[in-house]
From Swiss-Prot:
Job of this protein: DNA-dependent RNA polymerase catalyzes the transcription of DNA into RNA using the four ribonucleoside triphosphates as substrates.
Quaternary structure, from the entry: In cyanobacteria the RNAP catalytic core is composed of 2 alpha, 1 beta, 1 beta', 1 gamma and 1 omega subunit. When a sigma factor is associated with the core the holoenzyme is formed, which can initiate transcription.
Lineage: Bacteria, Bacillati, Cyanobacteriota, Cyanophyceae, Synechococcales
EC annotation from Swiss-Prot or TrEMBL: 2.7.7.6
Protein name: DNA-directed RNA polymerase subunit beta
Length: 1097
């Protein structure tokens, strides 16, 4: 394939940095967030007020991390830096000041790629979308069907305040969902007189009823109001005026307990049209009065008051890494503050130093807990570069302070008009998380307040102004202007061509002349996410299938020789580059040295810059990370140029699969129900071969009976099994291992009780001690095989941190090449997925008029009902591109260039391809897009012409090798004594109630009985059955299943007298072994050997 790419649809597709969400947020945390937190806790005074400890936050510093990123991964360490902050201890009595730099904990640092290395594993902190603090006005229907209104003031942290109206036009207030209190009681408690309130309201007459109601209750003074407030908020405690005062003060006016946050203040000011400075983060009297006023206007339906939509993106904000981390640091500092106060009280005042007061543990614990076990700190999805990039751009509504799956209704999950250009309407998981986990749209960015913005070009007098930077609008701003979509057709000078343009205005569509348009979207791609924007002809696919296509691209396994898509969208380069998988030149200069491990670039000043490449590293998902240089010695490079391909990249573009020749036709039923029929060429030419690296680990522990040993001396193992082990008993790198082979030899000391009777016999006869260790080696599991690519040994002597009780840890990495096989899952980019049902020799595959056999035969019935016609466009465009020997870039939504543009483009290309010499058969005007195929087995033509072409097909990570599993005997569950489930537990297959019905319907009573007893949980019966099979005797009758006994015990525990009786009415105790047929005694005895004095313990 020549690599000339033709851009079919020209639009502005320059994208912002795609990982900026993560990096910018962490940078904010280092520059501001951390300092803010440290300074908000300072000063800390002791209970007597004699000592003060100040944190000088702006003077914090970070030390160089102990390990670099690679080293941290290798040693299972955390890539973190030590934080030091200057503390000042002031003694108020003596005026003495002690200043000292104090260690306050370790802070994990973000790598260049926007990830964190925690205990050697790469993790991503997912962005969370939560309800923004501020004031919200809602309406509710009461029992009589009358509409009432309420207003909630939601802070960043602290108590909620909710005002509501009732059917008698009275105003009430609730604090944190407690009982209702008359609103005027709260006003009086806050020290406001009747006139103070009435002067602020535009419709005071409505409020007077509430004043009268308060007076009727006998609450006419501030003191009485405070008493009433205390009674309602703290029922059961003796009320006092001072208590009420303190309660009110701490709940709403103390910055430590109540914080609106910068965002909350901004939103309240905006909604209520206030001008309170954004440094005032607590409630003010003005906030409360304006909220009341707005609520009354709503009730009376005057003054332009409007309700809020809580699913609008103007009312939801994104909390990224920096803010989540800041909240966690606050938790740690809260704990630290308590400790410092205690130490101040206990210690000797004169000799105290800041270092003695500050204990780094609580802060370290809080940060560790966040990175290690928070719902938002996730193990990075590293299947391929796209998966990695998407994971960093993911936005979740779950997590602490967010929603839960069970509680989230339909409205929260639904697509909202304000998502346009901010959240992708397509990419979201299928299943219980649908709509709760979203992906950021391609051009979206998060502003300083955490609201998502998207860019537009300004339009003046019908002309789109594309000079300068685009203008970013948040969802609130966008509602107030008229916005045209990105695929509006324009003349060369930027003038909008059409007479009437569809625009969005206040979440509705209307048609206006070009002069009234305020903004135009930047690009048609800006609505969708990165993964979705890689799907060509997206506009011809049904949304459900596009969703599957987006999700399945993230599951594509990096192949041995990746190939760029013939038909792409032009965003492939940027995805590869921003994912961090491809090394990029840091300077302008010339390549002076290249090999598989490093690239050296000499800059203009003659300095060398070495870029080391990753070779065959294991990713989080066991796929292989490998980089291959694409520059040569002497090549000039510029800053930002891609110098090597990562996994699933080719030529600096993302390449998730292969372009294969596909025909849509049924073939002997082998592609029934989405199955795929594939050619042997995919196997022999290694088209879909991938490398997987599996990690096996064993530790030698200290046991009660002595240490375990890693050794070559393993009891009862033949010498040939040890052939590949070195003198320590560890497999050598490069050895090929099959299942059951020893990777690391290990012996464990065993006590007396572990010894089998024959050993005891030998010791009784000869009095000698057999070597009392047992083989506990690490072996290759059942279905695995491969080549050992790396062995790592960790010991305490080398300074490695080991788990408690371990003396040595050995890790073995085994790589395997997996060719494609029956049972593997494959998919296209349009949600067309299937399982391989048969691999056919290429001479039997249907072949083209020029003799080329096709690679994959798909079922044509997979297209019409699923409505993902994009695959057919891609197929034919790929066919044309392959015959023209070029690659095509098609930006989605091309109708701006004319109606039915996709069809015209494809047809033009096909006609162009047919003009090539000797290629006339490529396009048949009678049957456009179809060719006459012949059957490879008979050579006869098929009845109908068939759609044939090149499509980009992926091999997904659901490989049959990892799924296939069989069990003969294995572990059982402790309670029910039934076999466990799943491959990892060596489990059995579940025989559910429907399977039981099927056997009952056949009347297969004996088969059914043994499935439910000896093959499952009749403990005694299964042991006897095994014994009988081994000895070749008839299998005895089954007994009682263990789960039946468990059921009886459960009913008995409820106090029901339930038991099993014989015909004669005699009770049978199922818990006893009542089996006279037990021919084998429980243990062998050695009386017959004449060792009568042998002590059988």
């Amino acid at each position: 394939m020549s690599s000339s790419a033709i851009q079919v649809a020209k639009t502005a597709t320059y994208l912002p940095d795609l990982v900026e969400v993560q990096r910018a947020s962490f940078k904010w945390f280092l520059d501001q967030g951390l300092i803010e937190e440290l300074e908000s806790f300072s000063p800390i005074t002791d209970y007597t007020g004699k000592l003060e400890l100040h944190f000088i936050g702006s003077e914090y510093r970070l030390k160089r991390p102990r390990h670099d990123v690679e080293e941290a991964k290798r040693r299972d360490a955390t890539f973190a830096s030590q934080m030091y902050v200057t503390c000042r201890l002031v003694n108020k009595e003596t005026g003495e000041i002690k200043e000292q730099e104090v260690f306050i904990g370790e802070l994990p640092l973000m790598t260049e790629r926007g990830t964190f290395i925690i205990n050697g594993a790469e993790r991503v902190i997912v962005n969370q979308i939560v309800r923004s603090p501020g004031v919200y006005f809602k309406d509710e229907m009461d029992k009589n069907g009358r509409r009432t209104y309420n207003a909630s003031v939601i802070p960043n942290r602290g108590a909620w305040l909710k005002f509501e109206t009732d059917k008698n036009d009275l105003l009430h207030v609730r604090v944190d969902k407690t009982r209702k209190i008359n609103a005027h009681v709260l006003m009086r408690a806050m020290g406001l007189s009747d006139n103070d309130v009435l002067d602020k309201l535009r419709h005071p007459e409505f409020y007077k009823k509430s004043i009268d109601a308060a007076n009727d209750e006998g609450i006419s003074s501030e003191d009485q109001a405070l008493l009433e407030l205390y009674k309602k908020l703290r029922p059961g405690e003796p009320p006092s005026v001072s208590g009420g005062q303190q309660l009110l003060q701490t709940r709403f006016f103390d910055p430590k307990r109540y914080d609106l946050g910068r965002v909350g203040r901004y939103k309240i000011n905006k909604k209520l049209r206030l001008t309170i400075p954004d440094t005032v983060r607590t409630l003010t009297h003005e906030d409360v009065l304006s909220t009341l006023d707005y609520l009354i206007n709503l009730e009376l339906d005057v003054g332009g008051a409007s309700l809020d939509d809580i699913d609008h993106l103007g009312n939801r904000r994104v909390r990224s890494v920096g803010e989540l981390l800041q909240n966690q640091v606050r938790v740690g500092l809260n704990r630290l503050e308590r400790i410092i106060k205690e130490r101040m009280t206990v210690g000797e005042t004169d000799s105290l130093t800041p270092a003695q007061l500050v204990n780094p543990k609580p802060l370290v614990a809080a940060i560790k807990e966040f990175f290690g076990s928070s719902q938002l700190s996730q193990f990075m999805d590293q299947t391929n570069p796209l998966a990695e990039l998407t994971h960093k751009r993911r936005i979740s509504a779950l997590g602490p302070g967010g929603l839960t799956r069970e509680r989230a209704g339909f409205a929260v999950r639904d697509i909202h008009p304000s998502h346009y250009g901010r959240l992708c309407p397509i990419e979201t998981p299928e299943g219980p998380n649908a709509g709760l986990i979203n992906s950021l749209a391609t051009h979206a960015r998060v502003n300083e307040y955490g609201f998502i913005e998207t860019p537009f070009w300004k339009v003046e007098y019908g002309v789109v102004l594309k000079d300068g930077d685009p203008i970013y609008l948040s969802a609130d701003r966008e509602d107030e202007v008229r916005v045209a979509p990105g695929d509006v057709a324009t003349e060369d000078d930027g003038r909008i061509s059409a007479d009437l343009i569809p625009v969005r205005y206040r979440q509705d569509f209307e048609k206006v002349p070009p002069e009234q348009v305020d903004y135009v979207a930047l690009s048609p791609v800006q609505v969708i996410s990165v993964a979705t924007s890689l799907i060509p002809f997206l506009e011809h696919d049904d949304a459900n299938r596009a969703l599957m296509g987006s999700n399945m691209q993230r599951q594509a396994v990096p192949l041995l020789r990746p190939e760029r898509a013939l038909v792409g969208t032009g965003l492939e380069t940027q995805v590869a580059r921003d994912s961090g998988m491809v090394p990029i030149s840091r300077v302008n200069g010339t390549v002076t040295y290249v090999d598989a491990n490093a690239i050296v670039v000499q800059d203009e000043d003659g300095n060398d810059h070495t870029h080391f490449l990753q070779k065959y590293q294991r990713s989080n998902q066991d796929t292989c990370l490998n980089q291959r240089p694409i520059v040569r010695c002497g090549d000039p490079v510029i800053v930002g140029q891609v110098m090597a391909d990562g996994s699933a990249c080719e030529g600096g573009e993302i390449a998730l699969g292969q372009n294969v020749l596909i025909a849509y036709m049924p073939w002997e039923g082998y592609n029934y129900e989405d199955a795929l029929l594939v050619s042997e060429r995919l196997v022999t030419d290694d088209l879909y071969t991938s490398v997987h690296i599996e990690k096996y680990e064993i530790e030698a522990r200290q046991t009660k009976l002595g240490p375990e040993e890693i050794t070559r001396e393993i009891p009862n193992v033949a010498e040939e099994s040890l052939g590949n082990l070195d003198e320590m008993g560890i497999i050598r790198v490069g050895a090929f291992v099959e299942s059951g082979d020893i990777l690391v030899g290990k012996v464990t000391p065993k006590g007396e009780s572990d010894q089998p009777p024959e050993e005891k016999l030998l010791r009784a006869i000869f009095g000698e001690k057999a070597r009392d260790v047992r083989d506990n080696s690490l072996r290759v599991p059942g279905t695995e095989r491969g080549r050992v690519v790396d062995v790592r040994i960790y010991t305490r002597e080398q300074g490695d941190e080991l788990p408690p009780g371990a003396n040595m840890v050995v890790r073995v990495y085994v790589a395997q090449r997996r060719k494609i096989q029956v049972g593997d899952k494959m998919a296209g980019r349009h949600g067309n997925k299937g399982i391989i049902s048969r691999i056919l020799p290429r001479e039997d595959m249907p072949y083209l008029p020029d003799g080329t056999p096709v690679d994959i035969v798909l079922n044509p019935l997979g297209v019409p009902s699923r409505m993902n016609v994009g695959q057919v466009f891609e197929l034919l465009m790929g066919w044309a591109a392959s015959n023209l020997d070029c690659r095509v870039r098609i930006v989605p939504f091309d109708e701006m260039h004319g109606a039915e543009k996709s069809q015209q483009t494809v047809e033009t290309f096909l006609k162009e391809a047919a003009k090539q010499p000797g290629k006339g058969w490529v396009y048949d005007p009678e049957d456009p897009g179809k060719l006459q195929l012949r059957d490879g087995r008979t050579g006869l033509p098929f009845d109908q012409p068939v759609a044939v072409g090149y499509s980009h097909f992926l091999k997904l990570v659901h490989l049959v090798d990892d799924k296939i599993h069989a069990r003969s005997t294995g572990p059982y569950s402790l309670v029910t004594q039934q076999p466990l489930g799943g491959k990892a537990q060596q489990g059995g297959q579940r025989l559910g109630e429907m399977e039981v019905w099927a056997l009952e319907a056949y009347g297969a009573a004996y088969t059914l009985q043994e499935l439910l007893t000896v093959k499952s949980d009749d403990m005694q019966g299964r042991n006897e059955a095994l014994n009988a099979i081994v000895k070749g005797k008839p299998i005895p009758r089954p007994g009682t299943p263990e789960s039946f006994k468990v059921l009886m015990r459960e009913l008995q525990s409820l106090g029901l007298d339930i038991a099993v009786y014989t015909d004669e009415g005699k009770e049978v105790d199922l818990m006893q072994d009542v089996n006279p047929r037990r021919s084998t005694p429980s243990r062998p005895t050695y009386e017959s050997l004449g060792v009568a004095d042998y002590d059988e313990d």
